[in-house]
UniProtKB/Swiss-Prot annotation:
Stretches with biased composition (Basic residues): 111-130
Region annotated Disordered, chain positions: 102-130
PROSITE patterns: RIBOSOMAL_S9
Segments crossing the lipid bilayer: none
Any one GO biological process: translation
Family classification: Belongs to the universal ribosomal protein uS9 family.
Domain of life: Bacteria
Official protein name in the record: Small ribosomal subunit protein uS9
Keyword Ribonucleoprotein: yes
GO CC annotation: cytosolic small ribosomal subunit
GO molecular function: RNA binding; structural constituent of ribosome
Keywords, sorted A to Z: Ribonucleoprotein, Ribosomal protein
Length: 130
């Protein structure tokens, strides 16, 4: 019989993560690499674990992730969002715990665009009085 899999798509900044949860012993694999090799910062690894900790399912599921776009922070946020959405498919009763922790909300903050006449989004060229 085919193994049960739960899917979730997460987004953050310009990153998109496709997450699969498979019943297992808690392994996390990101882009076919161990997550500790892929994400070198412990703080971002904690971010990824948040949905599993909030629902007390840490160690019950293997997390298999394909993620592209953005940097470490964006990708970690996208994975967190995807894991939270996949956990909803596992059991809808996780919704209150995930919702109260703010893990189901897509973080809509994006990089502000550069404006003409300015050096960046808001940075103006140096002003000289004389």
């Amino acid at each position: 019989m085919a193994q049960v899999q739960y899917y979730g798509t997460g987004r953050r900044k310009s990153s998109v993560a496709r997450v699969r949860l498979v019943p297992g012993d808690g392994k996390i694999v990101i882009n076919n690499r161990d997550w500790e090799d892929y994400i070198p910062f412990a703080a971002l690894r904690e971010v990824i674990k948040q949905p599993l900790v909030a629902t007390e399912t840490l160690g019950n599921y293997d997390v298999l992730v394909n993620v592209h776009g953005g940097g470490y922070t964006g990708q970690a946020g996208a994975i967190r969002h995807g894991v939270a959405r996949a956990l909803l498919q596992v059991a809808p009763e996780y919704r209150p715990a995930l919702k109260s922790a703010g893990l189901l909300t897509r973080d809509s903050r994006m990089k502000e665009r550069k404006k003409p006449g300015l050096k960046g989004a808001r940075r103006a060229p140096q002003f000289s009085k004389r």
